[in-house]
Amino acid sequence: MSSAVRIVEKQLDEILAIARNPAQIRNAGTLAHVDHGKTTTTDSLLMGAGLLSPKVAGKALAMDFVAIEQLRQMTVKAANISLYFEYGGKPYLVNFVDTPGHVDFTGHVTRSLRVMDGGLVVVDSVEGVMTQTETVVRQALEEYVRPVLFINKIDRLIKELRLSPQEIQQRILTIVKDFNALIDMFAPPEFKDKWKVDPAKGQVALGSALHKWGITIPMAQKAGLKFSNIVDAYEKGYVDKLGEEFPLYKTLLTMIIEHVPPPNVAQKYRIPRLWRGDLNSEVGKAMLEADPNGPTVIAVSKVNKDPHAGLIATGRVFSGTIREGDEVYIIGRKMKKKVLQTYIYMGPTRIIVPYMPAGNIVALMGVDEARAGDTLVDPRLTEVPPFEKMRYIAEPVVTVAIEPKNPAELAKLVEALKDLVIEDPTLDLKIDQETGQILLSGVGTLHLEIATWLLKERAKTEFTVSPPLIRFRETVRERSQVWEGKSPNKHNKLYFYVEPLDETTVELIATKEITEEQDPRERAKILREKAGWDTDEARGIWAIDDRYFNVIVDKTTGIQYLREIRDYIVQGFRWAMEAGPLAQEPMRGVKVVLVDAVVHEDPAHRGPAQIMPATKNAIFAAVLSARPTLLEPLVRLDIKVAPDYIGSVTSVLNKHRGKILDMTQQEYMAYLRAELPVLESFTISDELRAAAAGKIFWSMQFARWAPYPESMLVDFVKQLRKKKGLKEDIPKPTDFVEVF
């Protein structure tokens, strides 16, 4: 039992020695559906590393170090820890990230995956593979992160469901089968077979994080342990003995070391997926090998505000060695910054280290301008392409208005809000410059509840929060006629039409396969081959709105002075896309096309104050003549319920405009998959519980945007406009432009 019980001070020198050898490093993290036991599992690992007393492991939630996390017994942010572990006579460094399981916090999962090579997927033995399990496994596989499986809460099968040893075995095989089905569905083709988990090979652990024991099949066979022995341990009260003989931390760390690849192996297949540069260049080769002597390249995965040290950027060193005092160049922000301090994490504590080589996770002080998703490089490498942009699965669809009780403290509140958005880019902050109104949007009500709680902690000022409002999107259903937008001084004329942007292009923008920064020829090729675009039109793209998924295309030829006002037209386009003409909701899936222009020769008469309104007004007129409509966000519900209650659960869903997509039945459980408007989801929890007498599990996650029902559209838009203090009547194109 001497595997890893030494305390961190003694370990620092040893950790640095191991950090120089990529073969002895593992970068992994927990991934799971909410409440399946990730953080309790991670606590068990901390105990094994001597960082947590055995008495409190399983109860401590040590990785939940934001006070509200311990209060709610759930993880809302991703936390890091470096663990020292001896296996097979060799010391290893396991850099571990604990991530949230609640659907409202998938943004934290997305960012964590960039630094991981392996994901320990924790599944509750009773609930099995749930929606969020599917989401995080899919995200992991998109980032080429290899999953291994821990089936947790085996005690529930024995104590709650009272299953026999044979039935427990059957339940485990069902979960493994469901898990492998996800890998079959989402894994990159070359890993579909290699990455499926096999209990016989020790790629699946079973246990109870609460009772601190865990085994794999090879371990059980070696020790002569049978399922009947585990059932006996619970029934006869000697479960502590299981924890002593088969400590969970040892089982999980062994599984991670055996089945999660080291950085120098993982980077060989991850770098071609995460980075579009030349793999044969000096920096490309260094990253493929995780070479500590190569040029410095770091992918930033998160940024946190420290009250004493300012902004701390955490990321993975993919090549080179970062040292205190080094200069780094932030690609995309085009600036150099000096690293003032380098750290590794021990839960909430940052430990200062003199350097950190390739393959490791590091925290940096001094690079204040860096943001999650940024790439930091050696200052000589200013032309190197950055890592692929991160793709967030959930979109901010719920909004609250925030107002300081004391107007004099507005600036203080805004400052704290801006810091929150830096830390969590899935939050969306809008401040109306004229009215001073602050709108904060998140992916769900819980996301906003936690954000406002953190705001209260940090801003140290009182404020009010409005009831949550749902965000909608505006779009068009057909091509409009051409509309003329005149500048306020009447010296410039711009001619636009709009049409729906096809779903394939929207998906290419969402997955970052096409971006504004891309080489226009490369982008045109992708659009031609995958979305059927005409080559000239694809090359004419001026800007891509990757926040709301719209594009602006220039189809003009030979217009004098057009190049000089291009940036102002793009700014006008972005302005129009942020709040459309129907109800000031963001536009989505719109292609804006410029077909002609008359531009004044004198720069004084064609500035932004002239060109931006002309652009916006013409776009608004075009939108209103293209059968505009509202899109509402839908959530997907995955429901497990006792078969007797299917009827009552279905009627609750029907009452809330829900639609059942799929239904299957097994011996004890019925499985329903449904879609439901977010607008209808606020009270659904209590109603479902009541309808099924509490015998129900369900999970929700953002599914898609769908047109609001046509029969109710006009009344609903009027209602929405009234709420926002706008004139109730829907505007006409002529409210924005003169007919020409």
Curated annotation (Swiss-Prot):
GO terms for cellular component: cytosol; ribonucleoprotein complex. Its main location: cytoplasm. Keywords: Cytoplasm, Elongation factor, GTP-binding, Nucleotide-binding, Protein biosynthesis. Residues 23-264 form the tr-type G domain. SUPFAM superfamilies: EF-G C-terminal domain-like, P-loop containing nucleoside triphosphate hydrolases, Ribosomal protein S5 domain 2-like, Translation proteins. GTP binds at residues 32-39, 98-102, 152-155. The keyword Protein biosynthesis applies. It holds the Pfam family GTP_EFTU. The modification Diphthamide is found at H605. It comes from the Archaea. InterPro entries: EFG_II (IPR041095), EFG_III/V (IPR035647), EFG_V-like (IPR000640), EFTu-like_2 (IPR004161), P-loop_NTPase (IPR027417), Ribosomal_Su5_D2-typ_SF (IPR020568), Ribsml_uS5_D2-typ_fold_subgr (IPR014721), Small_GTP-bd (IPR005225). Gene3D superfamilies: 3.30.230.10, 3.30.70.240, Elongation Factor G (Translational Gtpase), domain 3 (3.30.70.870), P-loop containing nucleotide triphosphate hydrolases (3.40.50.300), Translation factors (2.40.30.10). It is found in: Cytoplasm. One of its GO terms (molecular function) is GTP binding. Catalyzes the GTP-dependent ribosomal translocation step during translation elongation. During this step, the ribosome changes from the pre-translocational (PRE) to the post-translocational (POST) state as the newly formed A-site-bound peptidyl-tRNA and P-site-bound deacylated tRNA move to the P and E sites, respectively. Catalyzes the coordinated movement of the two tRNA molecules, the mRNA and conformational changes in the ribosome. Belongs to the TRAFAC class translation factor GTPase superfamily. Classic translation factor GTPase family. EF-G/EF-2 subfamily. NCBIfam families: aEF-2, small_GTP. HAMAP family: EF_G_EF_2_A. This is Elongation factor 2. It comes from Pyrobaculum arsenaticum (strain DSM 13514 / JCM 11321 / PZ6). The gene is fusA.
